[in-house]
Amino acid sequence: MYAITISSTTIGFASAYFPEYMKATFAGGIIFNMLKQRSKIDNLSSEGKREKLTGAVTFKNVRFSYPERPQIEILKGLSFTAKPGETLALVGPSGCGKSTVVSLIERFYDVKAGQVLLDSHDIRTLNPYHARSQIAIVSQEPILFDCSISDNIAYGLEERPSQQEIEAAAQKANIHSFIAELPDVRHQKSADQALTGYNTFVGDKGTQLSGGQKQRIAIARALVRSPKILLLDEATSALDTESEKV
């Protein structure tokens, strides 16, 4: 009788979690199915040309619609050319395709018709990883990681830049003065490292910083790469007037 009572009680407790178990099983199935899928554009592929770019971007009669909404065409025969060293601004209402153009230059998607050329090369013939290594992007919502400011600026590079290069990029992004005033919070310091606010941790998703400060650190992260192509997707939206002019 005791065993029956204990078993019934245990089953009663367990049954309360049954809906959550079913939700977890369903969610797990979706995740594992997604992991099994192969990307149409493989960033780790060894295929494609590895050209050293100069920074020219050309769109030739580009037509594009997102895979989720193939019937809605976002770009309808878009053509333009941006020469190396030129600044090209895309202006238009929300949803007109400005961010789509940025995504196509990064080759997050392939065009439906037409061509995207980097220099004179069709972007589809280039090695994705090699091409993207020469492009830097700053989005409207900057992404920072729970590490130091210095690590956030250097994040993603195969070879870590020197401290001088990091500070030079921060100066160009108009964030160096703010960083220099921060305290060094390291618990251990080597003899050859001076106190510097670049070692200050920014918190999860940069919660210790304002929107403008996060944006400028993201801009510094892009500049330290010395990219051939710099993409700014409303990157100055959170900046004050002075920083935006710089």
Enumerate the language-model features and the residues they cover:
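ABC-type nucleotide-binding domain
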Residues: 51-246
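Membrane-water interface of transmembrane alpha-helices in multipass transporters/channels
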Residues: 1-2
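Conserved E/DxxT/N motif and adjacent residues on the DHp alpha2 helix
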Residues: 33, 40, 154
